[in-house]
Amino acid sequence: MKLGSYHKNLTTSKNIIRDISAALNWVQEKYPKKKISIVGFCFGGHAAVIAPSLKGIDSTFCFYGAEVTAPRKNTNFAPKDLLEKVSGKLNFICGSSDDLIPLQDRLEIKKRFKKLDPLEERFIYVEVKGADHGFMCEERESFHENASLIGWNLLMKELN
C-alpha cells in the first residue's frame, strides 16, 4: 500500500492525460471502428475521471476513484474540472462508507453530474449504501457482494 501511494503521489494529471492519450491513439489506430471503454479502480478510477475529457472514449467506469474534486500537486485543475469536456458516458460508482471519498466529495460529484446531465443518461452516479473502498475485490476485507454485483452488472451491460 505504501509503495502504491508513493508512486501515485509522483504522478500529475498532465502525465495521466499524456499516457492515456498515447494509449488511446494506439487503440484508435489499431481498431478504428471499435467502441472504446475505460475502467479504473481506486487511483485508476481517479485517472478514469480524467480520461473521458479526451475525444474518442465512448464510456468510462470509475470505481471508487478518490481525489477527483481537488487539484493534484503540480496541476492547476481538478479532475472534476474536466467533466464539461466529456463526450461519452461516465459512470462513477462508490460506496457510502468509503473514507477515501468523503461525503463532501461524493455530494459535489453527484451535484456536478446532475447539473451536466439532469436526465442521467451520460453522467451516471451510483452510491451503494454501506460499501467501503475496494468493494469490488473479493480478496479484500472491504468486499461488498451487493455493491460488487451492482458494479459488475453496470459494466457488463455497457460492454455487451
Q: Language-model segments: what does each one mean?
A:
Residues 1-160:
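N-terminal cap/leader regions of alpha/beta-hydrolase-fold enzymes
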